[in-house]
């Protein structure tokens, strides 16, 4: 029957809250899991299930299986064609190749130009990942776009979903966590698979920080490049699980060390017809400042927090450092990478780095480096990787995962 508000209500229903006991616990890896295998549950927005699922809205129902494992089965990457070398930068700011390479390890970076777009790079990377995974766009259940620099204020994931041809209209949304974004994307994908019944999740890390750089500031313009990287995370049997554990954190107090804030509006007072003053209304169109960074503080933060985070993730996974085949860090600065590897006692030959060729590509750096390592044959099926992202927020997170 309809109530006064016009909504339909049911007759009184006994309160079952006190009878519901959900057998869920938090595992050592940080994921929520069931204490026992749950029954098959159909998730749908439709109230009734038609016997002929192929001819009714219930065809979009998806089985929810808990617990479930998840694994990485494909990767891809894309970079703009425009290459800017250290020598090129020396023509516009007071710097040189030796100064940049010594302090950062960076030699070149790629920058968007002309008709390049972040969505275009993301689609290219995602297409390559899908091809490697042998998954068609129609079978993607979720698109996660990890970026701080979308082409559209309201996000880029739905545009990517459309461009890829995901005809079943899967959920697509952005994750904003700066250079930690991709790791948080992996965690989000795993949570959706383990608890939401999703099978194939596309995780993309892509950023174009060159659009927010002050190209007259040699302290920041030398660091950043543009790129996109993607992986396909797929549901699997729990015994084949390939994402063993994670460790994630934020510290808002550290925002002062790395940020790109909204510029303050400068409004003239406006008087209405009755003489009242509107003051700052209506606001003028806002924009973001260029990236502001205290490099020394960011370095201290990274070399302290990242090793602790990786050690915590290893402990949750029940693995010693010796079980890790590769250390894959966010490609921010070679000094940071070397310092973290030293503190964790990882030899240089087990550390993945492509920073020299691309610079700091923010959320794209980890999947970009992973894709190159996989396609070059360095990372092989069955290899275990410790990865960690860290950056603005401040945010940082680590994951222990197995490739395929």
UniProtKB/Swiss-Prot annotation:
Q: Which residues are catalytic? A: 179, 330, 360
Q: What is its EC number?
A: 2.3.1.180
| Keywords, ordered alphabetically | Chloroplast, Fatty acid biosynthesis, Fatty acid metabolism, Lipid biosynthesis, Lipid metabolism, Plastid, Transferase, Transit peptide
Where does the protein end up?
Plastid, Chloroplast
Give, as one word, the top-level EC class. Answer: transferase
- InterPro entries tied to this protein: ACP_syn_III_C, ACP_syn_III_N, FabH, Thiolase-like
Instruction: Name its pathway.
Output: Lipid metabolism; fatty acid biosynthesis
Principal localization reads: plastid
> Which SUPFAM superfamilies does this one have?
Thiolase-like
The Swiss-Prot or TrEMBL record annotates one GO molecular function as: 3-oxoacyl-[acyl-carrier-protein] synthase activity
Instruction: Give an example GO cellular component term for this record.
Output: chloroplast
Q: Which GO terms describe its biological process?
A: fatty acid biosynthetic process
Transit peptide, UniProt annotation: 1-43
Q: Domain of life of the organism in this record?
A: Eukaryota
Listed Pfam families:
ACP_syn_III, ACP_syn_III_C
Which PANTHER family did the record assign?
A: 3-OXOACYL-[ACYL-CARRIER-PROTEIN] SYNTHASE, BETA-KETOACYL-[ACYL-CARRIER-PROTEIN] SYNTHASE III, CHLOROPLASTIC
Q: Which family does it belong to?
A: Belongs to the thiolase-like superfamily. FabH family.
What is this protein for, i.e. what is its function?
Catalyzes the condensation reaction of fatty acid synthesis by the addition to an acyl acceptor of two carbons from malonyl-ACP. KAS III catalyzes the first condensation reaction which initiates fatty acid synthesis and may therefore play a role in governing the total rate of fatty acid production. Possesses both acetoacetyl-ACP synthase and acetyl transacylase activities.
Record-given protein name: Beta-ketoacyl-[acyl-carrier-protein] synthase III, chloroplastic
Originating organism: Arabidopsis thaliana
Q: Give the source lineage, highest ranks first.
A: Eukaryota, Viridiplantae, Streptophyta, Embryophyta, Tracheophyta
């Amino acid at each position: 029957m309809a109530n006064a508000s016009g909504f339909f209500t049911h007759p009184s229903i006994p309160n079952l809250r006190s009878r519901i006991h959900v057998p869920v616990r938090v595992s050592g890896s940080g994921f929520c899991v069931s204490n026992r295998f749950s029954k098959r549950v159909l998730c749908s927005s439709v109230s009734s299930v038609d016997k002929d699922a192929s001819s009714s809205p219930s065809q979009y129902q998806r089985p929810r299986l808990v617990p479930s494992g998840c694994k990485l089965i494909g990767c891809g990457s894309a970079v703009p064609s425009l290459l800017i070398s250290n020598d090129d930068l020396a023509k516009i700011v007071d710097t040189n190749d030796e100064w940049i390479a010594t302090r950062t390890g960076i030699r070149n970076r790629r920058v968007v130009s002309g008709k390049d777009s972040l969505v275009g790079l993301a689609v290219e990377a995602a297409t390559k990942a899908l091809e490697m995974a042998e998954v068609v766009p129609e079978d993607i259940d979720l698109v996660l776009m990890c970026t701080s620099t979308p082409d559209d204020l309201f996000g880029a994931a739905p545009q990517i979903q459309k461009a890829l041809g995901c005809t079943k209209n899967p959920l697509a949304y952005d994750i904003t966590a700066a250079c930690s974004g991709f790791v948080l994307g992996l965690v989000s994908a795993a949570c959706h698979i383990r608890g939401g019944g999703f099978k194939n999740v596309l995780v993309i890390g892509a950023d174009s920080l060159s659009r927010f750089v002050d190209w007259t500031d040699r302290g920041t313009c030398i660091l950043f490049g543009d790129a996109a990287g993607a992986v396909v995370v797929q549901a699997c049997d729990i015994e084949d699980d390939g994402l063993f554990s994670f460790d994630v954190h934020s510290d808002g107090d550290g925002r002062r060390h790395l940020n790109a804030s909204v510029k303050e509006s400068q409004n003239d007072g406006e008087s209405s017809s009755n003489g009242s003053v509107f003051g700052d209304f209506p606001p003028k169109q806002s924009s973001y400042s260029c990236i502001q960074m205290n490099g020394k503080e960011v370095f201290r933060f990274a070399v302290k927090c990242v090793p602790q985070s990786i050690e915590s993730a290893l402990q949750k996974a029940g693995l010693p450092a010796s079980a890790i085949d590769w250390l894959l860090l966010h490609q921010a600065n070679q000094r940071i990478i070397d310092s973290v590897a030293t503190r964790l006692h990882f030899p240089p030959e087990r550390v993945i780095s492509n920073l020299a060729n691309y610079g700091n590509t923010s959320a794209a750096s980890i999947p970009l480096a992973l894709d190159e390592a996989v396609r070059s044959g360095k990372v092989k099926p069955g290899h275990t990787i410790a990865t960690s992202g860290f950056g603005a927020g401040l945010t940082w997170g680590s994951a222990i995962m197995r490739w395929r």
